[in-house]
């Protein structure tokens, strides 16, 4: 069942919000596949996702931006209501990840820190992202290979 959700999310990304992911990836120098993988892990790409955590904090949008970030986003005019706008959410998620990469380098630790503050939880999260990335990359390679064959063969 989980594989179906990942496939649906990847299909959804290919049409909706593709430009948002491309723009954020370029702006923050982060692979677009990584941003899509994080969105898939966070919410299965659900732009309207709003979740309350055990500690009472709230996560918004497909990148699940925690309300802890709101005071830092306020000077840029970004409110919790704007965080459910897919392109804004994508860019804020990329901005947060870019800060994590600046702190930890382009490592799995940085990717894990997008979601978790402790080492073990970072590792668990990074592994989830890695699994989705593998799926994205294998599907991309498959599409490339299929696209190289003459249509009569397909």
PLM regions with names:
Residues 11-16:
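N-terminal signal peptide c-region/cleavage motif recognized by signal peptidases
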Residues 6-8:
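Sec-dependent N-terminal signal peptides
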């Amino acid at each position: 069942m989980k594989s179906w959700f990942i496939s649906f999310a990847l299909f959804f990304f290919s049409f909706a919000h593709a430009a948002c992911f491309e723009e954020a990836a370029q702006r923050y120098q982060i692979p677009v596949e990584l941003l899509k993988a994080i969105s898939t892990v966070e919410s299965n790409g659900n732009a309207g996702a709003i979740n309350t955590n055990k500690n009472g904090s709230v996560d918004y949008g497909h990148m699940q931006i925690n309300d802890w970030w709101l005071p830092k986003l306020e000077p840029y005019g970004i409110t919790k209501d704007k965080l459910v706008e897919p392109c804004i959410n994508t860019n804020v998620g990329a901005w947060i990840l870019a800060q994590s990469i600046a702190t930890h380098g382009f490592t799995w630790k940085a990717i894990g820190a997008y979601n978790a503050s402790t080492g073990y939880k970072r590792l668990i999260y990074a592994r989830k992202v890695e699994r989705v990335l593998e799926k994205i990359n294998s599907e991309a390679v498959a599409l490339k290979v299929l696209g190289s064959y003459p249509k009569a063969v397909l």
